[in-house]
Amino acid sequence: MYYKCELLVDGYSYQVTDNLVNWDDITTSFKRGDYDGVVRSFSTKFEFSNAAYSLLKRVFREKYLQASASVVFYTRNNSWLWNERFRCSLDFSTFQDNGSTISISAVDDSLAALIKAKKGTQYEYVVSELTEGKYLYYDGIEMNQNVNWLVAGNSIEDSTDVSVEIQAALKSKYFPLAVKSSETSIGGYITYGDTFQQNVSDGGKDTFLFRAERNITCFLSVSISFNVPANKALSMTLVKIGADGNEAELTRTVINDEHPETIFILSYMKDITLLEGDYCFIRYGSAYNMTLTIRDPYISLNWDARIIPVNIDIVTPVKLLNRLLQSINGGQEGITGEIASGVDKRLDECMIVPAESARGLKNAKLYCSYTKFVDWMNAEFGFVPVIGEDKVTFVHRNSLFSKNVVKDFGDNIRSFEYNVNSALIYSRVRAGYDKQDYDSVNGRDEFHFTNEYTTGVTLTENTLELISPFRADAYGIEFLVQKRGEDTTDSDSDNDVFFVNAKLVSIDGRYRLVRTINGGPSISGVISPDTMFNAVYSPRYMIEANRRFIGAFTNMLDFASSDGNSDVVIDGVPEKIDIQLSEGERLFTVGELSVESGDMKAPEDLTGLISIEKGGETYYGYIKDGKFNYGRAEAVKYTLIVESIK
């Protein structure tokens, strides 16, 4: 007998080989679902007669829905010893009895089946239970801040000009200016306000256009063109008052009382260095009543600001993976997750930042599903899961397609059929992250959005989506941190999961963002290259992580567009560069080969190549799926992903 079947009931083993009715339906399959690891599965329905029929019927009658039994299937090896092929529990909720045969299904309690059933479930975790005491020292991005003022005058009909009434006075007065717009998300640098026409001597230290709250250098732009009536004298001065009360005139325009009607300009466009407490305003003085016509005024102050550093709770990818697997397993231990290290430095130096942790919310939570984790690992790093009996290991896809020939069928095959898998042919590739909308103009600097490429292939309209569900946008994290202290929630981003490129620093046990200064790549084309982070998670790096897979269907990716800042250059390589893929890098081709073989032994190494000879050519391919019938000597059916034809 080639196979053997046993029933396990109440700790006893019963030989039921002769009682298995559908013996020729007993199969084991190998399947590579999404160009990742090969998963084994087995038959899920059994039919029993005679002694096995009586045994199962008795168990069901005695224990009803608490009935329990398992089936074990063996095959004989070349040494005439029995090898267990699989075992599974029987599901008595599928119990069927026709009077002579009992039909009952197996409970597919394999890890692969468990993950398949729960992979889309989003779980909620308290971040403090995942951090393992790890913190990110977040010192922010240097951001551009600005304030713009307008002249607080009277509008002139059918004109963009404004008029200002000047009253004769012995004392100087503030020139009337009001805040028009501002971009000041980071406080503690500049306080700004309006000035209205009153005596400067009455205003004191609390009346100013802007005041420095710390030592700082800003860029001040002042350009006020004004039409002064003939023979009217006027002086206008941009003034800086020091914290010690000393006055400095930055620029001054003086018009005497002997001139025709003329346009004059008060202009200042320079860096201005301020000490804490210094403040500025514009004043005027005149002994005449007059009406000034102001044309195209521009008053603006720009400076760079950075948040006060904060600590953010962070989570390692492997910790999140294991917590997801525990949830999938009903909260029980017993399933472990591993992530291969030493393959991609970007992954080795990757830490997860829950949005609520960035916000600094009390009892911050992380929201994630197994599917999102898998999609992130695949799109960002080219890593895919290999599911075993009680362990899930994430490895780079390339490692699952070995160049070693593990089985040579020669020409001992039949039912040969080669075809092109059109589902693997893409005309476009989209890589990156979902576009985010920010309230700040600084957000225009962000480049962690979606890049789109064309492949030059017009045979299909398929699009390969390498879109990460986790976010890497530096400004997204920055704006969340800036919201610390706010009680309101942000439904648009509080449930998001971010990740950062960070290194552990031994001096204080905290993680630091990787930037150019501490080993990160050089970057240009952004507002602050020195403080920008996550450069290695740009969409182009995602393409590089998956380049051998992409090479299956194209040799060139032509950059088409970007949702974000495409002027970024990282380590001297423009983000919008076209990407060349050589034929030698190709992981496999779009061809598939279906064959049958009388060789009943499955390859030991499911990552290696199977070779087949046909018509004077040798085909090399990887297992996509294989079906083995252990109940009878039937040819094994293979579908191979063709690697090459020689």
Q: Positions of the model-derived regions?
A:
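Juxtamembrane "anchor/assembly" segments of surface/extracellular structural proteins
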Residues: 1-86, 91-276, 291, 402-403, ...
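Short beta-strand-plus-loop segments that form exposed binding edges in beta-rich domains
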Residues: 282-289
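Hydrophobic residues embedded in beta-strands of well-ordered beta-sheets
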Residues: 100-102, 280, 390-393
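Edge beta-strands of jelly-roll/beta-sandwich modules across compartments, strongly enriched
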Residues: 289-297
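Charged- and aromatic-enriched interaction segments used to assemble
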Residues: 77, 112-176, 220, 302-407
